[in-house]
From Swiss-Prot:
Cell wall biogenesis/degradation recorded as keyword: yes
Biological pathway: Cell wall biogenesis; peptidoglycan recycling
Protease as UniProt keyword: no
Matches recorded under InterPro entries: Beta_hexosaminidase_bac, Glyco_hydro_3_AS, Glyco_hydro_3_N, Glyco_hydro_3_N_sf, Glycoside_hydrolase_SF, NagZ_Beta-hexosaminidase
Entry protein name: Beta-hexosaminidase
Residues of the active site: 175 (proton donor/acceptor), 247 (nucleophile)
Enzyme class, first EC level, given as a word: hydrolase
Length: 345
């Protein structure tokens, strides 16, 4: 039910006990948990061995500026680089697929189940999204996003489309405050929601993460706590049958929904299967003590479906020609993107 974080680069006994709580289903790793590849491998091994139940181990390893593990890992390009720098659509989709495959392979080689990717927000004006987006035009960005997803799926990693129904149009950063999107309902349904709709119809999204954004012309609650968005639209209209993650309930944007227990209750009632709660250790304890909820059989099955099902050895991955070629190409692309941004921003 709950995905939480840990404080440092080693697992404490107190954290082991918290992770073994019946309501905890997994954890998310951050840059503070990472020093180098050897340390990360030891940390994940410690988690797997010391916690006496299967845990979903996750990370945000999107690429560009949102890449928690860097030293010893491929410098993944920002998603906007594919459309902007590729010579033609065929090259952009090929690069995107390579990136999805390589990212998933590197995570599996460290025994990490899932990277929360890809971002499907249209790149309007939100600084929190920015070059994390594949582009502004849904028709142009969809093939690139789909190619990235196909690369992840080829490796066997579950995919997470975020931030439903679209975070890209608001100026406010939901890490810091609750954003409000005042556009008419038609504007959201005719543009922002299209990448989610198309990829759901093709069965290519294992999970969805809704936004901590209030779409004022549609509902009074943030999408992450909205029955309208999660049950009526996502489940009933779009027929999505996968996992619904809440975005981090520790973010300021979730504060609109009350204290940590109230946020969790509202997210569950709205339709979330798994809840992220990060950087709030006291909040985690409050939820574990105060949340009265037993996950359903369907929610448990959805959770298990996200677990890694393929073993990848790092030395074998590094030795493969496909990996070597992809790493060289994608590192060069990210360097080109940084140079491009320096000249145009």
């Amino acid at each position: 039910m709950l995905l939480i974080d840990i404080k440092d680069k080693e697992l404490s006994q107190e954290e082991v006990e918290i992770l073994e709580h019946p309501l905890v289903s997994g954890l998310i790793l951050f840059s503070r948990n990472f020093h180098d590849k050897v340390q990360l491998e030891a940390l994940v091994k410690s988690i797997r061995q010391r916690v006496k139940k299967p845990l979903l181990i996750t990370v945000d390893q999107e690429g560009g500026r949102v890449q928690r593990f860097r030293e010893g890992f491929t410098k993944l390009p920002a998603m906007q680089a594919f459309h902007t720098l590729a010579k033609n659509p065929q090259e952009s989709t090929a690069l995107a697929r390579q990136t999805g495959w390589l990212m998933a392979a590197e995570m599996f080689a460290l025994d990490i189940d899932l990277s929360f990717a890809p971002v499907l927000d249209l790149g309007h004006q939100c600084k929190a999204i920015g070059d994390r987006s594949f582009g502004e035009n849904p028709d142009a960005m969809l093939p690139i996003a789909e190619a990235f997803i196909d690369g992840m799926r080829e490796m066997g990693m579950a995919t997470t489309g975020k931030h439903f129904p679209g975070h890209g149009h608001v100026l406010a950063d939901s890490h810091l405050e609750t954003p409000f999107d005042d556009r008419p309902k038609e504007a959201i349904f005719n543009r922002d929601i299209l990448p989610f709709k198309q990829l759901i119809s093709k069965g290519k999204l294992s999970a969805i993460m809704p936004a901590h954004v209030i779409y004022t012309q549609c509902d009074s609650q943030p999408a992450s706590g909205s029955e309208y968005w999660l049950k009526q639209v996502l489940r009933n209209q779009l027929n999505f049958n996968g996992v619904i993650f809440s975005d981090d309930l520790g973010m300021k944007g979730a504060g609109f929904m009350g204290n940590f227990v109230e946020r969790s209750e509202k997210a569950i009632h709205a339709g979330c299967d798994l809840l992220l709660l990060c950087n709030e250790p006291e909040g985690v304890i409050q939820v574990l003590d105060g949340l009265k909820y037993q996950p359903t059989k369907t929610q448990t099955e959805r959770h298990i479906s996200l677990m890694k099902r393929k073993t990848v050895r790092w030395n074998e991955l590094e030795a493969s020609p496909r990996y070597q070629q992809a790493q060289q190409r994608l590192t060069a692309l990210q360097n080109d993107w940084l140079e491009y941004k320096a000249q145009h921003c």
